[in-house]
Amino acid sequence: MKIVVLGAGAWGTALAMSAAAHAACHEVTLWARDAQQAQAMQAKRQNQRYLPGLAFPPGLHVASGDMGALAADADLVVVGTPMAALRGMLERLDGCAAPIAWLCKGFEADTGLMAHEVCAQVAPRLHSGVFSGPSFAQEVATAQPTAMVAASPRATVRDALVQAFHGPALRVYASEDIVGVEVGGAVKNVLAIATGLCDGLQLGMNARAALITRGLAEMTRLGLALGARPETFMGLSGLGDLVLTATGDLSRNRRVGLLLAEGRTLAQAVESLGHVAEGVYSARTVVQRARAVGVEMPIAECVVALLDGELRAAEAVARLMEREPTVERH
């Protein structure tokens, strides 16, 4: 099976390493936009920028240059770029015959669209889906046990992802609910900023548990309003990804909350990360999309107010705690 991973960031690199490591029959190519970066990775057999010290398996080749030619010869194309770059990548891949899956999590900032909606706009002929779930790149690259979801309305896409990545260290489940999987992946990043703030302010484990639980309710309400299945949010791409991102020390979005709690500005927090924290860029869009369908998301709204500088950390906590009493809704 010929697998092409487009984008040599931490996550694209980790999945390319995973596919090459567990199946000798796979031909895996990791494509980097920068030719010098590609040459350095191929020569040194590691991604020193994002996953330093982790050696590439023998079956992994690194390339740059003509992305279209690589995709045209592939059995599966995986797009490992951030959400902001997805539209341009899909436009370049329009007409590709191979199944295509993206890894990004979020809503497109300018349009409020989910990834599959962007694809329907710019490349409707593609057989496409999303590969998502509770997974840190570092752990996937070091073959620590992980479970993910391959979601697409097309069985060919789901089957290709299972064939490419299911192995001893990575268990892949299939789902038809691409809406639910994408909503879960987008909203959990926003909620992780809130739990990072909670932990940074040392509000305690009770507060963290409340944020995760009520955050899951917000995620579910938005997903159902957009056409998702309720059971998806109890699965890997919902509850699973939320728990990991909200509590894990490798979570960039949680780290943003921790830095804000220290008194850093948003610009300082983002600069110190060195990687993309999708929750920062998708928070406003999540809230806008929720308002458009009449869904209340008080935690996400507080995160946006905090990121915009309209609330201080202590004020955000007070706003949530002083809301009118209500029945518990999911």
Curated annotation (Swiss-Prot):
Protein name as catalogued: Glycerol-3-phosphate dehydrogenase [NAD(P)+]
Protein family: Belongs to the NAD-dependent glycerol-3-phosphate dehydrogenase family.
GO CC annotation: cytosol
Statement: the UniProt record of this protein carries the keyword NAD: yes
Pathway: Membrane lipid metabolism; glycerophospholipid metabolism
InterPro entries: 6-PGluconate_DH-like_C_sf, 6PGD_dom2, G3P_DH_NAD-dep, G3P_DH_NAD-dep_C, G3P_DH_NAD-dep_N, NAD(P)-bd_dom_sf
Localization per Swiss-Prot or TrEMBL: Cytoplasm
PROSITE patterns: NAD_G3PDH
This protein's record includes keyword Transcription: no
Broad class of the protein's primary localization: cytoplasm
NCBIfam families: PRK00094.1-2 (NF000940), PRK00094.1-4 (NF000942)
GO MF annotation: an example: glycerol-3-phosphate dehydrogenase [NAD(P)+] activity
Function: Catalyzes the reduction of the glycolytic intermediate dihydroxyacetone phosphate (DHAP) to sn-glycerol 3-phosphate (G3P), the key precursor for phospholipid synthesis.
Enzyme nomenclature, EC number: 1.1.1.94
Pfam families cross-referenced by the UniProt entry: NAD_Gly3P_dh_C, NAD_Gly3P_dh_N
Catalysed transformations (reactions): sn-glycerol 3-phosphate + NAD(+) = dihydroxyacetone phosphate + NADH + H(+); sn-glycerol 3-phosphate + NADP(+) = dihydroxyacetone phosphate + NADPH + H(+)
Disulfide bonds: none
GO BP term, example: glycerol-3-phosphate catabolic process
Coiled-coil residue windows: none
